[in-house]
Amino acid sequence: DHASFVATCAAITDYMEDRPLGSKLLQIYDRQFALISATVMTYNIVGHQREPDYLQYLVEELADSKFPHDIPNTFEFAQIQVEKLSQMIAKVKKGMKTMTNLGHMEILDSGASGAVNFVMGLSGKDVGVAYKERIDHGIYAVSVRGSKNCKVHLGKIVNLLATSLGGSGGGHDKACGAVVPKPKIKKFITELNKKIK
Protein backbone atom coordinates (compact mmCIF):
# COMPACT_ATOMS: atom_id res chain seq x y z
CA ASP A 1 0.00 0.00 0.00
CA HIS A 2 2.84 2.41 0.87
CA ALA A 3 4.48 1.55 -2.46
CA SER A 4 1.90 3.70 -4.26
CA PHE A 5 2.98 6.66 -2.13
CA VAL A 6 6.66 6.11 -2.98
CA ALA A 7 5.70 5.75 -6.66
CA THR A 8 3.76 9.03 -6.45
CA CYS A 9 6.84 10.80 -5.06
CA ALA A 10 8.97 9.27 -7.80
CA ALA A 11 6.53 10.43 -10.49
CA ILE A 12 6.67 13.99 -9.13
CA THR A 13 10.46 13.98 -8.87
CA ASP A 14 10.83 12.60 -12.39
CA TYR A 15 8.45 15.19 -13.91
CA MET A 16 5.90 12.49 -14.73
CA GLU A 17 2.95 13.58 -12.60
CA ASP A 18 1.07 14.70 -15.75
CA ARG A 19 1.41 11.30 -17.41
CA PRO A 20 -1.56 8.89 -17.13
CA LEU A 21 -0.11 6.69 -14.37
CA GLY A 22 1.51 9.58 -12.50
CA SER A 23 -1.72 11.56 -12.63
CA LYS A 24 -3.69 8.59 -11.33
CA LEU A 25 -1.22 8.08 -8.47
CA LEU A 26 -1.35 11.76 -7.51
CA GLN A 27 -5.14 11.57 -7.14
CA ILE A 28 -4.72 9.08 -4.29
CA TYR A 29 -2.92 11.58 -2.03
CA ASP A 30 -3.35 15.20 -1.08
CA ARG A 31 -1.35 17.10 -3.72
CA GLN A 32 0.55 19.36 -1.29
CA PHE A 33 1.38 16.42 0.99
CA ALA A 34 2.77 14.47 -1.97
CA LEU A 35 4.70 17.48 -3.32
CA ILE A 36 6.45 18.30 -0.05
CA SER A 37 7.16 14.64 0.65
CA ALA A 38 8.67 14.15 -2.83
CA THR A 39 10.75 17.31 -2.45
CA VAL A 40 12.10 16.36 0.98
CA MET A 41 13.00 12.87 -0.22
CA THR A 42 14.69 14.24 -3.34
CA TYR A 43 16.85 16.65 -1.35
CA ASN A 44 17.81 13.88 1.06
CA ILE A 45 18.71 11.46 -1.73
CA VAL A 46 20.65 14.00 -3.80
CA GLY A 47 22.39 15.42 -0.74
CA HIS A 48 23.53 11.96 0.38
CA GLN A 49 24.21 10.45 -3.05
CA ARG A 50 27.74 9.44 -2.06
CA GLU A 51 26.63 7.87 1.22
CA PRO A 52 25.28 4.39 0.43
CA ASP A 53 24.65 3.57 4.10
CA TYR A 54 22.33 6.56 4.49
CA LEU A 55 20.56 5.77 1.21
CA GLN A 56 20.03 2.19 2.40
CA TYR A 57 18.63 3.58 5.65
CA LEU A 58 16.14 5.71 3.67
CA VAL A 59 15.06 2.69 1.64
CA GLU A 60 14.53 0.67 4.82
CA GLU A 61 12.49 3.45 6.43
CA LEU A 62 10.29 3.82 3.35
CA ALA A 63 9.93 0.04 3.15
CA ASP A 64 8.68 0.17 6.76
CA SER A 65 5.85 2.43 5.47
CA LYS A 66 7.26 5.61 6.98
CA PHE A 67 6.57 8.98 5.41
CA PRO A 68 9.43 11.48 5.02
CA HIS A 69 8.18 13.54 7.98
CA ASP A 70 8.47 10.38 10.14
CA ILE A 71 12.16 9.90 9.28
CA PRO A 72 14.42 11.85 11.66
CA ASN A 73 16.14 14.98 10.30
CA THR A 74 14.86 14.72 6.72
CA PHE A 75 13.17 18.12 6.79
CA GLU A 76 16.18 19.75 8.46
CA PHE A 77 18.51 18.30 5.86
CA ALA A 78 16.18 19.41 3.05
CA GLN A 79 16.34 22.94 4.47
CA ILE A 80 20.14 22.87 4.22
CA GLN A 81 19.88 21.76 0.59
CA VAL A 82 17.37 24.52 -0.18
CA GLU A 83 19.78 27.11 1.23
CA LYS A 84 22.54 25.80 -1.06
CA LEU A 85 20.18 26.01 -4.03
CA SER A 86 19.16 29.56 -3.19
CA GLN A 87 22.83 30.54 -3.32
CA MET A 88 23.01 28.85 -6.72
CA ILE A 89 20.47 31.31 -8.18
CA ALA A 90 22.89 34.24 -7.88
CA LYS A 91 25.70 32.19 -9.40
CA VAL A 92 23.53 31.15 -12.35
CA LYS A 93 22.41 34.73 -12.98
CA LYS A 94 26.06 35.79 -13.08
CA GLY A 95 27.59 32.88 -15.02
CA MET A 96 24.92 31.63 -17.40
CA LYS A 97 25.22 32.06 -21.17
CA THR A 98 22.47 31.84 -23.76
CA MET A 99 22.26 30.66 -27.35
CA THR A 100 19.32 30.75 -29.74
CA ASN A 101 17.55 27.71 -28.27
CA LEU A 102 19.14 27.06 -24.88
CA GLY A 103 20.78 28.44 -21.78
CA HIS A 104 23.98 26.82 -20.53
CA MET A 105 26.52 27.10 -17.75
CA GLU A 106 29.61 25.37 -16.46
CA ILE A 107 29.22 24.55 -12.78
CA LEU A 108 32.36 24.77 -10.68
CA ASP A 109 31.35 24.21 -7.06
CA SER A 110 28.34 21.89 -6.95
CA GLY A 111 26.56 19.25 -8.99
CA ALA A 112 25.21 20.11 -12.43
CA SER A 113 21.79 18.62 -11.72
CA GLY A 114 21.17 21.11 -8.91
CA ALA A 115 21.69 24.10 -11.21
CA VAL A 116 20.15 22.99 -14.49
CA ASN A 117 16.56 24.00 -13.73
CA PHE A 118 17.74 27.47 -12.73
CA VAL A 119 19.71 27.73 -15.97
CA MET A 120 16.61 26.81 -17.96
CA GLY A 121 14.27 29.08 -16.03
CA LEU A 122 16.51 32.12 -15.72
CA SER A 123 17.65 31.95 -19.36
CA GLY A 124 14.09 32.26 -20.65
CA LYS A 125 14.81 29.34 -23.00
CA ASP A 126 12.96 26.04 -23.24
CA VAL A 127 16.16 24.06 -22.64
CA GLY A 128 18.79 24.41 -19.93
CA VAL A 129 22.20 22.71 -19.86
CA ALA A 130 24.53 22.56 -16.86
CA TYR A 131 27.86 20.77 -16.99
CA LYS A 132 30.62 20.04 -14.52
CA GLU A 133 34.12 18.84 -15.27
CA ARG A 134 35.19 15.56 -13.71
CA ILE A 135 38.89 16.32 -13.77
CA ASP A 136 39.98 12.84 -12.69
CA HIS A 137 38.11 11.28 -15.63
CA GLY A 138 38.68 13.86 -18.40
CA ILE A 139 34.96 14.27 -19.01
CA TYR A 140 32.07 16.59 -18.33
CA ALA A 141 28.95 15.39 -16.52
CA VAL A 142 26.08 17.12 -18.29
CA SER A 143 22.52 17.65 -17.10
CA VAL A 144 19.80 18.77 -19.54
CA ARG A 145 16.24 19.91 -18.79
CA GLY A 146 13.39 20.98 -21.01
CA SER A 147 10.35 23.08 -20.19
CA LYS A 148 6.83 21.91 -20.90
CA ASN A 149 7.07 23.93 -24.14
CA CYS A 150 10.09 21.95 -25.36
CA LYS A 151 8.91 20.13 -28.49
CA VAL A 152 11.74 17.61 -28.91
CA HIS A 153 12.68 14.44 -27.01
CA LEU A 154 15.86 15.61 -25.30
CA GLY A 155 16.83 12.11 -24.11
CA LYS A 156 16.96 10.76 -27.66
CA ILE A 157 18.83 13.79 -29.02
CA VAL A 158 21.34 13.77 -26.16
CA ASN A 159 21.91 10.02 -26.56
CA LEU A 160 22.76 10.30 -30.26
CA LEU A 161 24.81 13.47 -29.87
CA ALA A 162 26.86 12.35 -26.86
CA THR A 163 27.52 8.96 -28.48
CA SER A 164 28.67 10.61 -31.71
CA LEU A 165 31.19 12.63 -29.68
CA GLY A 166 32.64 9.62 -27.85
CA GLY A 167 30.50 9.90 -24.74
CA SER A 168 27.17 8.51 -23.64
CA GLY A 169 23.83 9.81 -22.49
CA GLY A 170 20.09 9.82 -22.71
CA GLY A 171 16.99 9.83 -20.58
CA HIS A 172 13.50 11.21 -20.61
CA ASP A 173 12.00 13.68 -23.06
CA LYS A 174 12.37 16.64 -20.68
CA ALA A 175 15.12 15.47 -18.30
CA CYS A 176 18.31 13.69 -19.29
CA GLY A 177 22.05 13.62 -18.89
CA ALA A 178 25.29 12.81 -20.61
CA VAL A 179 28.96 12.18 -20.18
CA VAL A 180 31.00 14.08 -22.76
CA PRO A 181 34.79 14.01 -23.30
CA LYS A 182 36.30 17.30 -22.11
CA PRO A 183 37.54 18.45 -25.55
CA LYS A 184 34.05 17.97 -27.03
CA ILE A 185 31.89 19.94 -24.58
CA LYS A 186 31.66 23.10 -26.70
CA LYS A 187 30.72 21.07 -29.76
CA PHE A 188 28.12 19.20 -27.71
CA ILE A 189 26.43 22.44 -26.65
CA THR A 190 26.62 24.00 -30.13
CA GLU A 191 25.18 20.90 -31.80
CA LEU A 192 22.48 20.50 -29.16
CA ASN A 193 21.44 24.11 -29.76
CA LYS A 194 21.06 23.33 -33.49
CA LYS A 195 19.01 20.17 -32.88
CA ILE A 196 16.35 21.64 -30.58
CA LYS A 197 14.71 24.17 -32.89
Label for each model-derived stretch:
Residues 1-104, 108, 120-127, 131-134:
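A structured phosphate/pyrophosphate-recognition subdomain
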Residues 21, 103-197:
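Glycine-rich, acidic loop segments that terminate in or are immediately followed by a histidine
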